[in-house]
Amino acid sequence: MLSGWLRACALIVTGLVSVSTLADDKQRTAIVVGGGMAGLTAAYELQAKGWQVTLLEAKPSLGGRSGLATSEWIGNTKAQPVLNRYLDTFKLATVPAPEFVRTPSYLIDGVYFTQADLAVKQPATAEAIKRYNDTLDNLARSITDPENPASNSTLFALDQINVANWLDRLNLPATARQLINQQIRTRYDEPSRLSLLYFAQQSSVYRSVDERDLRASRLPGGSTVLAQAFVKQLKTIKTNSPVSSVVQDKDHVTVKAGTASYTADYLVMAVPLRSLGKIQMTPSLDAQHMGAIKSTNYGWRDQIMLKFKTPVWDSKARMSGEVFSNTGLGMLWIEPALKGGANVVINLSGDNARIMQAFGDKQLVDQVLIRLHAFYPEARGAYTGYEIRRYSVDPSTGGSYLAFGPGQISKYWRLWERPIQRVAFAGEHTDTLYPGTLEGALRSGQRAASQVQDLAAGKSFEPVKVAPPKAPAPASQKSDCNFFTSLFGCTSDKPVEPAKPQAEKPGFFSRLFGGSDTPVAAPAPVEKAPEPAPAPAPVPVAPVVAPVVTPPAKTEPVKKPAAKAEPAKKTQHKEPAKKEPAKKEPVKKEPVKKAPAKTDDAKKPAAKAATDTAPADVKS
């Protein structure tokens, strides 16, 4: 009897398990839009987990914004861990980088300099570059959490400043500034278009990575080789399939690409923001996402490969790795030609690329060749042709890579990490630590694939909420004043520092960039402070205002108790008490003589009144 009961229970359990198994056996489906590195990674990871994946790419080829170079410098496992893991997975061999390319070098007026050469032959330029690097390191050190760079109101304020203004304050020599501008353009965008907070955040990410680790080896064939390795693993790829619309309902996502329509459980959107803006989303994206699509800054880059019969540059100038030019040549490196000859890859970035926007490809190449020929007279005779990639004028990309402009971290930080219903987002622009890099694209593809699996498992996905700095925070930012004084060369007079946040727009920023005299002269409001004085005696008001303006130096000792607003208020009550005796003796001339003496007393409360009004502005 007992055995029969157990047998019946076993049959029931088996039936339940069978039903559950049938439900689980239903293969999950996903569509990946975008065949760049991020999309390829997401598709690969989902397929590896048993998903049926369809990848749609608008162009005839895959790999996205891969460069022209037939071999690419890559970092070691410390600098690019995800990239190196995929290289190991696909058994793609790399070649160790020679030592001379592992640090940046320079081409100054056609003369090649290593960092060691620069220190000997142009010590002033070398010293200025070192000073810049040290100051940048101090700036990066202030960001303790790169995933939440605006952790306090002081750092939050850096997002309102562009990098060019910060560089202006460093007073760099002309050549050093040109080289530094070129480096920033190449890695991000024009300094005047780049948020100082974003620049500091990126510097903090790489602060623990030695410059040499960023070019530790070479990948023969470039990133195209890695893209092809992904492609070989994927089962369903549709090229020449530009997506025009995405419709989400309760259980599915439907994608229209050309005349074809595809339906799946979930979707990974792995296209640049400008391309995303051309896709009709239903339900539509909210105002914040649409604002990010339209206004998020992308770096500009034109990449040109000039081909020569023979090397026309100095054979001793081993120009490779990163070589920054102080002229219009931008950043360049020598690219080995696979079939003999010699190639040079030139990157025009930032406003250098924007200026050339009106030029056709051949005109642009001619402009670059003219500059190269000025330094190497054999260039035109040995020149055989060119290849070009113009990311910024490509309607499908609208730029080369993410480069947050002033105020944009405040609005759009980590916005694209959150899935919207059944759609997850990938692409270098969605990665917090390594945007604009191959590493960032690979990481974002992994994250999006993981999010889609979480959504399929029924998990509610909430974004990492980064709370904006609280309003009262500036009052407790005394330690941050030291940070700014070291950054922008302010005086070490600590009592003056709290005046920085007094008026966030005029006073704080003028102080931030070395305008230390401006806040001290700012007792212009002091003229308004004595305005209550006319009530007791209109005549003495004129002599009171004049002395306050003439000796602003006296505000320095008075500002010591600037934080104590209550004692300052007491001094304001003493003013009428002292002026009353002046009323009682109007006829006597002697008290009139004493009146100027009392104006000396009036100066002090007036100056204190100026310091009292400043903290009030901060609170407001």
Which functions belong to the PLM regions below?
Residues D25-G36:
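Beta1/beta-strand and adjacent pyrophosphate-binding region of the FAD-binding site
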Residues D145-H252, S261, A270, F404:
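Active-site/ligand-binding neighborhood in enzyme catalytic cores
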Residues T70-N138:
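Dinucleotide-binding Rossmann-like beta1-alpha1 core, especially the glycine-rich loop
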Residues M269-A287:
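Flavin (primarily FAD) binding-site architecture
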Residues Q47-L68:
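Glycine-rich FAD pyrophosphate-binding loop
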Residues R28, A257-Y266:
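Core beta-strand elements of the Rossmann-like FAD/NAD(P) dinucleotide-binding domain
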Residues T41, H252, W300, K316-D480:
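Conserved flavin/dinucleotide-binding core of flavoenzymes
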